[in-house]
């Protein structure tokens, strides 16, 4: 969250009391929406943990999802270098847009978002009926079988590379990535965990 010093340095005069607040998905990086905060909206956002804007049409504080339940749970808030714009990282509960989409900016999402969405789907299949899908059946087969599939797909990916078959390499790499994500979910891990570890190694 913002430090006390950061809050004091916010330039409300420059923005006429309404500061743009960009809300970004804390995990996928997708830009979810843009709203405006006055000091009271920022205070409520920090106190409640839910993104709250000042509605210019209703002329009052408005917590995103206050009627639908599709709130935005705040992870962090940071000012930009000029102290006149806020970046809010949040985890959404349900779709952010009133049109039912994850972002108010439609399909203008980063390709990496698909991996996050795939992870969510795989997590749901973890407790599904084994007869309902290949993924659910794979979970039911147990960790050893899932790990075996990762090993098999890893070997097939390497073999495709050794013969310079780019088409087959792409297919096998996709299979490997899928089974690796299943294995991570099986062990209650995810890509974020792996990314955090890679980031630590890079430092």
Curated annotation (Swiss-Prot):
Record's catalysed reaction(s): 1-(5-phospho-beta-D-ribosyl)-ATP + H2O = 1-(5-phospho-beta-D-ribosyl)-5'-AMP + diphosphate + H(+); 1-(5-phospho-beta-D-ribosyl)-5'-AMP + H2O = 1-(5-phospho-beta-D-ribosyl)-5-[(5-phospho-beta-D-ribosylamino)methylideneamino]imidazole-4-carboxamide
Matching PANTHER family: HISTIDINE BIOSYNTHESIS BIFUNCTIONAL PROTEIN, HISTIDINE BIOSYNTHESIS BIFUNCTIONAL PROTEIN HISIE
Coiled-coil annotated residue ranges, if any: none
Source organism of this protein record: Salmonella typhi
GO CC term (a single one): cytoplasm
Top EC class for this record: hydrolase
Entry keyword set: Amino-acid biosynthesis, ATP-binding, Cytoplasm, Histidine biosynthesis, Hydrolase, Multifunctional enzyme, Nucleotide-binding
EC number(s) per entry: 3.5.4.19, 3.6.1.31
Superkingdom, natural source: Bacteria
Gene designation per UniProt: hisI
Annotated region (Phosphoribosyl-ATP pyrophosphohydrolase), positions in chain: 115-203
GO MF terms, alphabetically ordered: ATP binding; phosphoribosyl-AMP cyclohydrolase activity; phosphoribosyl-ATP diphosphatase activity
Lineage: Bacteria, Pseudomonadati, Pseudomonadota, Gammaproteobacteria, Enterobacterales
Family: In the N-terminal section; belongs to the PRA-CH family. In the C-terminal section; belongs to the PRA-PH family.
Subcellular localization: Cytoplasm
HAMAP family cross-referenced by the UniProt entry: HisE (MF_01020), HisIE (MF_01019)
Name of this chain's protein: Histidine biosynthesis bifunctional protein HisIE
Region span, Phosphoribosyl-AMP cyclohydrolase: 1-114
Functional pathway: Amino-acid biosynthesis; L-histidine biosynthesis; L-histidine from 5-phospho-alpha-D-ribose 1-diphosphate: step 2/9; Amino-acid biosynthesis; L-histidine biosynthesis; L-histidine from 5-phospho-alpha-D-ribose 1-diphosphate: step 3/9
Keyword Nucleotide-binding included in the entry's annotation: yes
Any one biological process term the GO annotation gives: L-histidine biosynthetic process
Principal subcellular localization: cytoplasm
């Amino acid at each position: 969250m913002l430090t006390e010093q950061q809050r004091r340095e916010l330039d409300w005069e420059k923005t006429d009391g309404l500061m743009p607040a960009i809300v970004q998905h804390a995990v996928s990086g997708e830009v979810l929406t843009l709203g405006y905060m006055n000091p009271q909206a920022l205070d409520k956002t920090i106190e409640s943990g839910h993104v709250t804007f000042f509605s210019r049409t209703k002329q009052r504080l408005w917590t995103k999802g206050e009627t639908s339940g599709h709130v935005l749970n705040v992870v962090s808030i940071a000012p930009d270098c000029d102290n006149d714009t806020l970046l809010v990282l949040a985890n959404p509960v349900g779709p952010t847009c009133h049109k039912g989409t994850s972002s108010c900016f439609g399909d203008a999402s980063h390709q990496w978002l698909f991996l996050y969405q795939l992870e969510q789907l795989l997590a749901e299949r973890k407790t599904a009926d084994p007869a309902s899908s290949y993924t659910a059946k794979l979970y039911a087969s147990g960790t050893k079988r899932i790990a075996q599939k990762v090993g098999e797909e890893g070997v097939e990916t390497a073999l495709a590379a050794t013969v310079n078959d780019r088409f087959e390499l792409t297919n096998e790499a996709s299979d490997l990535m899928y089974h690796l994500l299943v294995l991570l979910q099986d062990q209650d891990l995810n890509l974020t965990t792996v990314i955090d570890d890679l980031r630590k190694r890079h430092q």
